[in-house]
From Swiss-Prot:
Protein name per its UniProtKB record: Endothelial differentiation-related factor 1
Location of the region described as Disordered in the Swiss-Prot/TrEMBL record: 34-67
Subunit structure: Interacts with TBP and the transcription factor IID (TFIID) complex, NR5A2, NR1H3 and PPARG. Interaction with TBP is regulated by phosphorylation. Binds NR5A1, ATF1 and FOS via their conserved basic region. Interacts with JUN. Binding to calmodulin is regulated by calcium and phosphorylation of the IQ motif.
Residues modified to N-acetylalanine: A2
GO CC aspect terms: cytoplasm; nucleus
Keywords: Acetylation, Calmodulin-binding, Cytoplasm, Developmental protein, Differentiation, DNA-binding, Methylation, Nucleus, Phosphoprotein, Transcription, Transcription regulation
Organism from which the protein derives: Rattus norvegicus
Polar residues biased stretches: 48-58
Residues modified to N6-methyllysine: K25
Places the protein is found: Cytoplasm; Nucleus
Length: 148
């Protein structure tokens, strides 16, 4: 018990800097002066809540010299979506709600502005009951027996 005097204070734990303090310009400069590794990265699309990002290979797009654009949904597919939606008596908003997408997504697909996404196309196909992919575009989907 000789090492514990009444006058000395032993600090057992010391809190580190909070997240806000660690991000400050002052903290970054201090860490650089100490020679520590500092990693800075910018958040990408943080507040935009993007559900379906473009998954096409951008490096492949960069290597192409002739056409520097992604393929869009054809107008034929857009017209089929529009006809199928109207035959079911749905508005763009109703169809979007039914497939858990935003109304703007449906508008983009119908106008031919959207980059095709198989997941979204599959949901629209099931909702309107018409094929949108492959060679039989516009034909009704045959419903087979359910697998058990």
């Amino acid at each position: 018990m000789a090492e514990s005097d009444w006058d000395t204070v032993t600090v057992l734990r010391k809190k580190g800097p909070t997240a806000a303090q660690a991000k400050s310009k002052q903290a970054i400069l201090a860490a650089q002066r100490r020679g520590e590794d500092v990693e800075t990265s910018k958040k990408w699309a943080a507040g935009q809540n993007k559900q379906h990002s473009i998954t096409k290979n951008t490096a492949k797009l960069d290597r192409e010299t002739e056409e520097l654009h992604h393929d869009r949904v054809t107008l034929e597919v857009g017209k089929v979506i529009q006809r199928g939606r109207q035959s079911k008596g749905l508005t763009q908003k109703d169809l979007a709600t039914k497939i858990n997408e935003k109304p703007q997504v449906i508008a983009d697909y119908e106008s031919g502005r959207a980059i095709p996404n198989n997941q979204v196309l599959g949901k629209i196909e099931r909702a309107i009951g018409l094929k949108l992919r492959g060679k039989d575009i516009g034909k009704p989907i045959e419903k087979g027996p359910k697998a058990k």
